[in-house]
Amino acid sequence: MSIRYESVEKLSEMIKNNEIKPSEVVKDIYDAIEETDPTIKSFLALDKDNAIKKAKELDELQAKGQMEGKLFGIPMGIKDNIITKDVETTCASKMLEGFVPIYESTVMNKLHDENAILIGKLNMDEFAMGGSTETSYFKQTVNPFDHTAVPGGSSGGSAAAVAAGLVPFSLGSDTGGSIRQPAAYCGVVGMKPTYGRVSRFGLVAFASSLDQIGPITRNVKDNAIVLETISGVDRNDSTSAPVEDVDFTSEIGKDIKGLKVALPKEYLGEGINEDVKEAVKNAVETLKSLGAEVDEVSLPNTKYGIPSYYVIASSEASANLARFDGIRYGYHSKEAQSLEELYKMSRSEGFGAEVKRRIFLGTFALSSGYYDAYYKKSQKVRTLIKNDFDKVFENYDVVVGPTAPTTAFNLGDEIDDPLTMYANDLLTTPVNLAGLPGISVPCGQSNGRPIGLQFIGKPFDEKTLYRVAYQYETQFNLHDAYEKL
């Protein structure tokens, strides 16, 4: 019996009841990867020897009845910008090819403490810059629902691997939609937690005021279980919030009668595909049938989210990526004849086109003559966007809308057109700019490609998002679709 499509919750139950050994789970997962991943191309590196070794150690603990840890024996895949000790971490870039970290990220320490098993590292857009996984230096991941379509990005490998049944859960990072958009495109569940909910220690920085790590799963409850495991304050990350640990599963199963839901008119306006609009309208009717009260509201500064985001994110990236200089670690140009040439050539040869574009954009926005006109102005717009959400949340519990304006686009269609590519972030970037939590769940399909529904919550109110997402999932999900892929 293949367990590749079983949930985290079900696998945990099977292991605790001695119905299956961790080593059998791991073998089944690697068999699935061997069979499917040559087509999907979601993994960049496999940690097979260590995974098999750990699984056998857990077998022995299982035999003794010592099955400690929320994720005991559960396999996982990790986006390749999250540091994994002794396992190559490249950020899908030539710049970090062959880089093997000597320390562990906080989220990995937490997952190891709960006895999860690392299967491997997952493909992504280079340094998390992109929305299709097409900027990866190493390979092009495809969408499990349609191999001619992108899986989204930048956490495309993380979403594709979960949808294809290659891991029951993965971790991604979300700077402007990089968990939620690929989750929408691949028909899975992706949570971008509140900024500060999850430690960023060991996440290779793109934009430090926007980045956040979160889980991708095939159902809502699994997602809550994983977020519970990785969240919490961390002394190694000064931006992690000193909030109490939360039982995220405690709200799951509670009804949503009387829950006040806001539907921004801007989220169904210009640029939103008709099939996506229809699916979201149907989802809203479903929420009403479950007892929620849904009203139309306005988030007037939504349209400024993309320009504000790309100035701020690129500015922070230009500073963060200055550390990749060809000297301390990473790609080192062999042709350089001087120190200046070494810097220039290592960075020119080591970074891909999209990363260089954003470094240029960010450096320009921070330059003395343009700082006020671009970076400072973008931060003011960011405040306006946050104020819009604050005003809505005075009267509503949750905001709902599409995750992305369209379904997954075809491979190659937008990679040479950055403005069209950036437009896919219309509905996700405002959430990062405001530091809010957002979750994407499947709500339909168009020509076989999944459509994502996004719920946005108040700061640190992921519990309510899980509550409403779970209730919606009972009425619509793609659980039967995964095994047919």
Swiss-Prot record:
The active site is at residues 79, 154, 178. Gene3D superfamilies: Amidase signature (AS) domain. Transmembrane segments: none annotated. Pfam families: Amidase. The keyword Protein biosynthesis applies. GO terms for biological process: translation. It is an enzyme of class 6 (ligase). GO terms for cellular component: glutamyl-tRNA(Gln) amidotransferase complex. InterPro entries: Amidase (IPR000120), Amidase_CS (IPR020556), Amidase_dom (IPR023631), AS_sf (IPR036928), GatA (IPR004412). Its EC number is 6.3.5.7. Keywords: ATP-binding, Ligase, Nucleotide-binding, Protein biosynthesis. It catalyses: L-glutamyl-tRNA(Gln) + L-glutamine + ATP + H2O = L-glutaminyl-tRNA(Gln) + L-glutamate + ADP + phosphate + H(+). Belongs to the amidase family. GatA subfamily. Allows the formation of correctly charged Gln-tRNA(Gln) through the transamidation of misacylated Glu-tRNA(Gln) in organisms which lack glutaminyl-tRNA synthetase. The reaction takes place in the presence of glutamine and ATP through an activated gamma-phospho-Glu-tRNA(Gln). This is Glutamyl-tRNA(Gln) amidotransferase subunit A. The lineage of its organism: Bacteria, Bacillati, Bacillota, Bacilli, Bacillales. The gene is gatA.
